[in-house]
């Protein structure tokens, strides 16, 4: 409960409760494509949010759980109900419409230039973070992740950058702390 409620980035001058439902590992995949061979031209980015039915199903379930919690007498006494597109929403179709009207990114894009094996057709980077087919170019940020992590990207991106620095400098990896033969013995 706060002094100002933020709705789609705008402050509403009254107390309120804001609840976010997050898909930490969405199935929907977007695309980043070159618009031109000119490096100064912005790429074509399509995040393709909520394109996978499983993502929609999880969001609807999250809304239903949140609604059930907020309708409990212990909490309901502190609020007057939902606002905007969420007011009087009950059916799955209404929930999906409200989700599509209010969904936004968590601003943690990742996996758009993912690392993978030579057999992985979706992988842009090899296991040394080098762009396949391009000499002298590596990527060492969240886009190199093969799959989305659950949680904030910051520490993982630092680890990727540290590993990339070691690769560029030609440092050998540290030996395994627990070699497999000792684990299985």
What are these regions (language model features)?
Residues 1-156, 164-185:
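FAD-dependent oxidoreductase catalytic-site/capping-region signature
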